[in-house]
Amino acid sequence: MLQINSRLAVIDGWLVDTVKRKPINFRSPEVRLLLPNDDDYKKLSQQNLVDWTRLKKDSNSVLVGVKSMELFKHIKLVLREFFLLEDGRIILKRIRSKLRYKVVKKLTCKCCRLNLPKWGTVYIHPMLKDKEKPLAGVCEFSLDVNPDREYPLIEINVSHQYIIIEGFLLYLNERRLYRWNDNNLRSQVGLTKWAHLRKTYNPVSLDILYSLNSNFYFVKDDLLFQLLGKRVFVKFCKVMENGKCGKAPLWYRVKRTTTAKATHIAYAISNSTAPDSFKSKNNDYRFIVREKPIVENTISNLDYSDIKKQQFTEAEVVKRKISADISQIENVHTQFNSQKEKNNIRVNKVSSEVLDQISKFPVSRVTLLLISAGQDKNYIELVEELARRLEKICIEKTTQSLEEIRDTFQANPEMQARFDKEYYQSIEEYKITLELIKEDLLITLIKQMENMWAAEKKFSTEEEYVSPRFLVADGFLIDLAEEKPINPKDPRLLTLLKDHQRAMIDQMNLVKWNDFKKYQDPIPLKAKTLFKFCKQIKKKFLRGADFKLHTLPTEANLKYEPERMTVSCSCVPILLDDQTVQYLYDDSIIPEFEATSSYATKQSKCGGKMSLQMEPDLLFQEAIRRMRHLTAYDVLRRNYIAAFEELYMGNCND
């Protein structure tokens, strides 16, 4: 370090204001003001100083590494967040909305901001040389999400999605943490399943945090902070318990701070014990703290082992108390709970790779499926918008029909009050059923629509008549007289076709019928002409998770197959030379369910309009039957498909 005067010094080619602790550009006019002495200015001009303009020219990123540990000991550093893009650039986090490139990594480091005339802003940070130890207070970090880790995904009545991360219950519909010992949650899940899930996963971390005297709780898994979104910067402070001095025991608490002084990142939640202070400037917060620090602050005299010991000791005591309290609640409610629980609970596994790609909330089951399938953000947003429009159409249509039934009792307030109990319950039930239908059908409908487009594009021109009776289309030889595909090697063609016609067939790349013997399941085809001219039969199959059809299992194994997967599909049978039959089906047609979903409402057989001349009790029963019919799974499913076709045709006409 070369001292120019009492204020300025040159450190490894950098001119530094040692009073304000910042680098100064040698070309800046303020340099001459700080060096009124000509000898000092001449001394400075003889130094080999860093050209700031080269920083921007030599780098396509705003974050530039500098190999000078001595420099960073004499300048102020602030904590900033950056994005590493797929094109290799590093940019400041706040301008992400202007980007077209995918964010590969999120990182944070302590750095110093430099303003370059005509070139904008860059941030310099210490770039370590070999065998150098990190500078005190400087450490890069990024949220490190393990893509192979799996988490419990709890689905309640199809439409409510929860995941558990290190004992914290996160509600994906609202991006909100829930206490497990919550009356509304217990009512939503049902007591029996609530108790079972608690014993299996014990998601009581938020309950523990609210019960601690400490205002923090350490978490190792970065995915929780990734999903919770907005984070705050914090540091640990020593305090005396109960605010006393002298012999009072030492205590650690977390305090929000500036990025320059922060040691950890955290997620802040309001203290539920003081809800009235939520809007107060001095409201009390508790913090879920990322265990890994963002800086190694050697200047601080805090011992992190003591901090972790404080939390562990206190949390173990609180955990036992909470477990005992919840067990008591379970025992008391079980004795007096005689009602049958109707809620449908499903527990699956979801990978952190899928959860890490969630871009916005709320999150539905369909969204998770699309992410798992590798669909991009724009495609998922289009599907979500389509789902919202379909749901709106179905709800408006069903609600209008239910309102017409409800209006029947306007003249009888007592009967209307009695009917309203069933009415509002039906509204809740059919909305749940719509969520199930969306999960069952939406992806299939979109897939069939895409297949239809592909089929029309691929096969619209591939037709050639060999004779008035035989047509070649979609890779098949079609017998128009018998309305069926025929084997190109069929001996009958020797008498039905002339030599030049058979030669024409031999030169065409037609499907080889022996290849059909390799398949046990029906074969999906995008063959518009084939299905147009060939006779089709109705056949029952099973629809798999891959949306393809499979042959029905044997009678011995039939009970293991989900009833809701059985579908009825039109197909073209092909008799092979070994007398076995193979089936071809149109992949662009939506198969009809033979049986409703296991969660579906049973369809009523009633129909038609109600007669106002009925006795009040009979009229009430008829209204209930009509309402059950309109909210049945099969009826809502037909409405959903009709709404999809309406939107599809509307877009086509546009």
Curated annotation (Swiss-Prot):
Stored InterPro entries: ORC1-binding_dom, Sir1_ORC-binding
Main location: nucleus
ORC interacting region (OIR) as annotated region, ranges: 449-587
Presence of keyword Transcription regulation: yes
Statement: the UniProt record of this protein carries the keyword Repressor: yes
Region named Sufficient for interaction with SIR4: 322-654
Compartments (UniProt record): Nucleus; Chromosome, Centromere
Taxonomic superkingdom: Eukaryota
Pfam families (alphabetical): Sir1 (PF11603)
Entry keywords, A to Z: Centromere, Chromosome, Nucleus, Repressor, Transcription, Transcription regulation
GO cellular component terms listed in the entry, alphabetical order: chromosome, centromeric region; nucleus
Task performed by this protein: Involved in the establishment, but not the maintenance, of heterochromatic silencing at the cryptic mating-type loci HMR and HML. Is recruited by interacting with the ORC1 subunit of the origin recognition complex (ORC), which binds to HML-I or HMR-E silencers, DNA elements that direct the formation of silent chromatin at the mating-type loci. Establishes transcriptional silencing by recruiting the three other SIR proteins, SIR2, SIR3, and SIR4, that function directly in silenced chromatin and establish repression. Also found in centromeric chromatin.
Subunit structure of this chain's protein: Interacts (via OIR domain) with ORC1 (via BAH domain). Interacts with SIR4. Interacts with CAC1.
Protein name: Regulatory protein SIR1
